[in-house]
Amino acid sequence: ERIQQLRQYDRRIFDLEDEINRKLSKLDAALQRCNIRLSNYVSNTDSKSYKEVVARISEGITDPKVLVEEIHGRIINRHGRKTIIAALTGVITQADSDMMRQIREEIDIAERHKQECIDKMQEICEKEYSDQLRNLQTIPGVKLRAATSLIAEIGIDMSHFETANHLASWSGLKPRNDESNKVIKSKRITHGNRYLRRTIIECSWAASRTQGCFFSRFSYHQTQ
């Protein structure tokens, strides 16, 4: 029953993340329509500078010389103050400001709900599965959020998976065996559990950037 609850929270988190990404894309489209090209210069549309600029615009502040004060100094140094001011210069109507405010509020609500689910998962795992939670976090690339997600999607009874290959196959990360008359038609991965697959892929990327571990060295040699 506890695993089922964790799974509900976990999949809700993934749905909320997708929703937030869609809203961020909508927000950027609204800015682009006003000829504001800030996304060309910030690392991503979820950055603090980007959010602060949107907040000021939704409050009715449209002067680029005022908006540029919300941009991180590193971005200004990299691209130049004049370039950033030009990117913040656009034509913004009252309707545009209202739409941005509404989208921003929707993102804030989704982020709050996401954090509530994360807190609930952490609370359950620390109470019921503290040993498994601690052990999972010793794996390179696996932090608290990933550990709770793995417990939710896999459970704690590993007797269901005889080998690591069985688990990889269940998550959909094992290439399919589509061969006929010694001709390989496809090596695409199977469908599997898309939530588990997403978590494992995120962990593998994190592990490839963890200094001193095998995955980091393997990833480096693969790119050479």
Where are these regions (language model features)?
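A detector of single, family-specific signature residues
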Residues: 1-224
